[in-house]
Amino acid sequence: MVKLRLKRYGRKQQNTYRIVAIDAQSRREGRALEEVGFYNLRKDQTQLDILAIVNLIREGAQPTETVYDILRKAGIFERIKANP
């Protein structure tokens, strides 16, 4: 199963995350199948590849709780419901 989850980058105390599609059994820093976004918690910046995320979710990818919240705030799930 493919999951959408956060992959940690950055220095100590200055975390940034990439939102990646990765096999559910891979470790957090494992090889990603696809990079679909960026999330900087400190500056509250988010950059998403919306088309790639929508396609992955339609194919069955499951977001983690944190990624789900990020996608919900960006309105991804409304787009999926609007265009089935």
Swiss-Prot record:
Q: Main site of residence?
A: plastid
Indicate where this protein resides in the cell: Plastid, Chloroplast
Keywords per UniProt: Chloroplast, Plastid, Ribonucleoprotein, Ribosomal protein
Q: Which GO terms describe its biological process?
A: mitochondrial translation
Q: Name one GO molecular function term.
A: structural constituent of ribosome
What InterPro entries does this protein's entry cite? Answer: Ribosomal_bS16, Ribosomal_bS16_CS, Ribosomal_bS16_dom_sf
Spell out the PROSITE patterns in the cross-references.
RIBOSOMAL_S16 (PS00732)
Q: What Pfam families does the entry give?
A: Ribosomal_S16 (PF00886)
CC per GO annotation: chloroplast; mitochondrion; small ribosomal subunit
Give the record's family classification: Belongs to the bacterial ribosomal protein bS16 family.
- Under which name does UniProt file this protein? Small ribosomal subunit protein bS16c
Q: Which organism is it from?
A: Anthoceros angustus (Hornwort)
